[in-house]
Amino acid sequence: MAIKSFNDKDTEALWEGRKTKKSWPINQIGERALRKLNVLDAATKLNDLRLTPGNRFESLEGTDEYSIRINQRWRICFAWEPADQAAIDSGSIDLAEAPGSALNVYIDDYH
């Protein structure tokens, strides 16, 4: 599926190729962040993000969010909306294998 929404105007601006005034160092992480956003946009299920070890895909403790790493300091955080919630609820498919979309995407300082 695709990225459906952003939680941060600056992350959305980066995705759309617009200038941003965000405090994160766009000149240092911008190109790599955009590559990772493309990876997220191309993912059809959460397990797709596990295929590349460099993503360092993880579930964020205490939230319904996930992240992939841009580098040691920065990560892209997002929620996952399965296309068929009823299949998840019935147990016929695991969330990690369920087709879906990324929601509320934003770049966060890990430290």
Describe these PLM feature segments.
Residues 1, 35, 52-55, 63, ...:
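Sequence-level motif detector for i,i+2 pairs with an aromatic at +2
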Residues 1-36:
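Arg/Lys-rich, positively charged N-terminal/basic patches that mediate binding to nucleic acids
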Residues 4, 30-33, 49-53, 71:
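Generic structural signal for well-ordered secondary structure
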Residues 7, 33-36, 56, 70, ...:
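Amphipathic alpha-helical interface surfaces
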Residues 18, 22, 58-60, 110:
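Basic, Lys/Arg-rich DNA-contacting stretches centered on the C-terminal catalytic core
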Residues 40:
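Conserved phosphate-interacting/catalytic interface
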Residues 44-67:
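A short, surface-exposed loop/turn module that caps and links secondary-structure elements
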Residues 61, 66-111:
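Enriched for short, Lys/Arg-rich terminal
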